[in-house]
């Protein structure tokens, strides 16, 4: 079978579908903050930034954290990768987990230590994907292989994330799993 298209196979009598993540989603690397700074302060607009520490705090039930901001060149605002409700972010450095963005994250800049993922309508429940990426044994194995090395900073590559094979049961099954996980 080729990794370039969906694979149908039989598992316990049912047809299963698998897709490359890049086939069913829009994957966008976060922005390098230094590249969006205005040359002149008066030409900038202030935007909140999504951080790994915010996501970790939220996982631990802490909601009263400080939100850092960045001054953005007004000409570059339309090209910003901003957080949207129900999209996914994956931490590329240290965090190495998928998180579903909620209403409180909307409009925050997604910086370069994240990749954001938006699924094509009706293909993937974001909460199911978070479970699949964070907990599925095969994905955990792939993540561990990807972050091995001699470097003190363990980084996931955007290419590795794009090439992940994702099992896609029907949407109602995905939603059931996602509800249990979140």
What is each PLM-predicted segment?
Residues 108-115, 148-175:
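A short glycine-rich beta-alpha junction/loop motif
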Residues 22-37, 54-85:
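Sequence-specific dsDNA recognition surfaces
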Residues 75-78, 104, 151:
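A structural connector/turn signal
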Residues 1-46, 168-182:
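Non-catalytic DNA-recognition/assembly elements of restriction-modification systems
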Residues 125-160:
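Short, positively charged
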